[in-house]
Amino acid sequence: MPSGVRRRKMNRSSITKVTRKDKDNHKRIVVTGSDIIRQRWDKNLSMAQNYKKLGLATKTGSRKIRGLEEDLREKSLRLTIQQGKNPHDQELRDLMEQQEQEELEKSNLVVNERKIPKLGAGEAFIVRDDKGEVVEVIYGKDHQTGSDEEDEEEWTGFEDKPEEEETETIKILQERAKRAASNPHVQSDREQSWIEQLINKHGDDIDGMFWDKELNIYQQSRGDLKRRIKKWKQGNKRNQ
């Protein structure tokens, strides 16, 4: 090993030193959620693999569209060609421009040798003559009298698709969710004392309690006061 000046130069070198990679230093997934998931978690699998095995979704907002990757690759290729990064792609660029022109012509209508864009519901196109006067107004599909054969076909609903089988983990989680016990509100000693003061002062007069500026300082509504008094009376009956 060099020492002194040579060693300091090596330490300042921009060349990355070869170090030993240890898998034990990788971040391990710690399951802190439901005990049902924790018991069925396989440490040898990744998080995505475990979620797929259990029948869960890793991201609730993720979109999985068939052919999306192909569309993205096609857009990336189209952008690369349009930017002219490769000078040998001129023929391919011309071919793609020709295909775009053909698709545009298919999607447009032709009226009086003028291309009319494809109109949707609630849209219209005004045809003018050389003097700028309105000759014709072309409406969207909802206003057009003539419809294509595709529009005349009656919609019969979505095709029945086989639903994915629920895993055992999903069934257990659903059963637990059904048995989830509600946590009833327990009145504190301070709340009970406050309600008792209202009853001693106003009796059953809810309107008087509502307009009492000294006791009802937080302006609790009439319905809220009724619910609190009803719960207070039920608690006193159980304690008697």
UniProtKB/Swiss-Prot annotation:
The keyword Oxidoreductase does not apply. Its main location: nucleus. GO terms for cellular component: nucleolus; ribonucleoprotein complex. One of its GO terms (biological process) is ribosomal large subunit biogenesis. Residues 1-11 have a biased composition (Basic residues). Involved in the biogenesis of the 60S ribosomal subunit. This is Nucleolar protein 16. It comes from Yarrowia lipolytica (strain CLIB 122 / E 150) (Yeast).
